[in-house]
Swiss-Prot record:
Superkingdom in the source lineage: Eukaryota
Disulfide topology: none
Task of the protein: As part of the heterotrimeric replication protein A complex (RPA/RP-A), binds and stabilizes single-stranded DNA intermediates, that form during DNA replication or upon DNA stress. It prevents their reannealing and in parallel, recruits and activates different proteins and complexes involved in DNA metabolism. Thereby, it plays an essential role both in DNA replication and the cellular response to DNA damage.
Matching CDD domains: RPA2_DBD_D
Predominant subcellular localization, coarse grouping: nucleus
One Gene Ontology term of the molecular function aspect: damaged DNA binding
Quaternary organization: Component of the replication protein A complex (RPA/RP-A), a heterotrimeric complex composed of RPA1, RPA2 and RPA3.
Protein name: Replication protein A 32 kDa subunit
DNA-binding region, residue range(s): 76-150
Compartmental location: Nucleus; Nucleus, PML body
Keywords: DNA damage, DNA recombination, DNA repair, DNA replication, DNA-binding, Nucleus, Phosphoprotein
PANTHER family assigned to the protein according to its UniProt record, in alphabetical order: REPLICATION PROTEIN A-RELATED, REPLICATION PROTEIN A2
Modification(s) after translation: Differentially phosphorylated throughout the cell cycle, becoming phosphorylated at the G1-S transition and dephosphorylated in late mitosis. Phosphorylation increases upon replication fork stalling.
Length: 275
């Protein structure tokens, strides 16, 4: 599942993270299609399904089973930024935002008898990869995490979104009736900076060489309607969970690359797209 270094024992497709990963595990989505009997006997716990927060929030529940379309899921992974962290004696509650929907509650139980790394609180503003079980209590969904690992390389954010697309397309092709339409809607409208187009079609900023931070800031500036453009102070207010230096570096990069330009002064910016 997870190795001693905090990563997957066999990542998606077994590429660079060890062998026997998501695409190659027995009965996994990269294996030959199992028979109906095998499908029924296979435990959901053998599958770790890459998802977006939007998909998890829209998943349907029948008894203790969650589904996206016809696909069962129990163990899931999400990648996002920590917006809030609150530590209690027995657990840590995070709000993790992958910018496809409202931030999702992620609860990690801690060992009260040991001062292990699992008991350390990940600070807000950090990107993390969460692996855990989808749960619902009083009609509110959350993830109970068995592992939360920091994401240092933003390529992992983009890689996760590609894993999401591949996993749910594969589940769709296995679960959809022959000749039928799509059984699993990806439902990833994108909410980078509360504006659309984050992960859909050709407007995906991640494919244009931008990091998630840069994409979020660019979309905020695009969505601002004032004639003078968005002020840097307004950016800081909107991105209160993000480090000021990170915001400044992203703004400088976007300006140098021609995505935005300054207007009335060096602290107001508009998008060169003219949206």
């Amino acid at each position: 599942m997870w190795n001693n270094h905090g990563g997957f024992d066999g990542g998606y497709g077994g590429s660079g993270m060890g062998g026997g990963g998501y695409m190659q595990s027995p009965g996994g989505f990269g294996s030959p299609a199992p028979t109906q009997g095998e499908k029924k006997s296979r435990s959901r716990s053998q599958q770790i399904v890459p998802c977006t927060v939007s998909q998890l929030l829209s998943a349907t529940q029948n008894d203790e089973m969650f589904r996206i379309g016809e696909a069962e899921l129990s163990q899931v992974t999400i990648v996002g930024i920590v917006r809030h962290a609150e530590k209690a004696p027995t657990n840590i509650l995070y709000k993790v935002d992958d910018m496809t929907a409202a931030p999702m509650d992620v609860r990690q139980w801690v060992d009260t008898d040991e001062a292990s790394c699992e008991n350390m609180v990940v600070p807000p503003g950090s990107y993390v990869k969460v692996a855990g079980h989808l749960r619902s209590f009083q009609n509110k969904k959350s993830v109970v995490a068995f592992k939360i690992a920091p994401v240092d390389d933003m390529n992992e954010f983009v890689s996760h979104m590609l894993e999401v697309v591949h996993a749910h397309m594969t589940m769709n092709s296995q679960g959809a009736p022959s000749g039928g339409g799509s059984a699993v809607a990806l439902n990833t409208p994108g909410r980078l900076g509360d504006s659309g187009g984050a992960f859909s079609g050709g407007n995906d900023n991640a494919t244009n060489g931008l990091t998630p931070h840069q994409s979020q800031i660019l979309n905020l500036i695009k969505s601002f309607k004032g004639n003078e453009g968005m002020a840097f102070e307004e950016l800081k207010n909107r991105l209160h969970g993000m480090n000021v230096n990170t915001i400044r570096q992203a703004v400088d990069f976007l300006s140098n690359e021609g995505h935005i330009y300054s207007t009335v002064d060096d602290e107001h910016y508009k998008s060169t797209d003219g949206d």
